A protein has these predicted regions:
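Nucleotide and nucleotide-moiety/phosphate-recognizing core
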Residues: 3-114
Length: 114
């Protein structure tokens, strides 16, 4: 499983951290967010919004991410933006290959299925 935290401005990703540490996402997410912000000299109050993937994805992972994002958005008074996982993957494909006409995003269901 992958847990990702990114900082973006406009359409550009300024920095990102991807964790591939098994099932420790709940314990690692908040410190990873803090590390990402500190390494970019950004305070939480500087953020304009908080975005989170809304699925599909791991049930527990989505719950941890959603709860963390919702708590941050609420405590900072910032908007919370839910982004469907497959929509984000399709957009990334088009960003990398602007000549493409179609994209078919898929994720590993961890059961030898997509």
């Amino acid at each position: 499983m992958v847990c990702s935290v990114a900082l973006s401005k406009g359409k550009s990703v300024l920095d990102a951290i991807d964790l591939q540490d098994g099932m420790n996402h709940a314990a690692l997410l908040a410190p990873t967010i803090e590390r990402l912000l500190q390494s970019n000299s950004v305070k939480p109050s500087d953020l304009d919004a908080i975005a989170v993937c809304s699925g599909p994805g791991s049930y527990t992972g989505l719950r941890v991410g959603s709860a963390t994002a919702k708590a941050m958005a609420y405590s900072l008074g910032k908007p919370l933006i839910a982004i469907p996982t497959l929509q984000a993957l399709a957009q990334a494909a088009f960003d990398l290959h602007p000549e493409a006409e179609y994209a078919l995003p898929m994720i590993d269901a961890r059961r030898r299925e997509v």
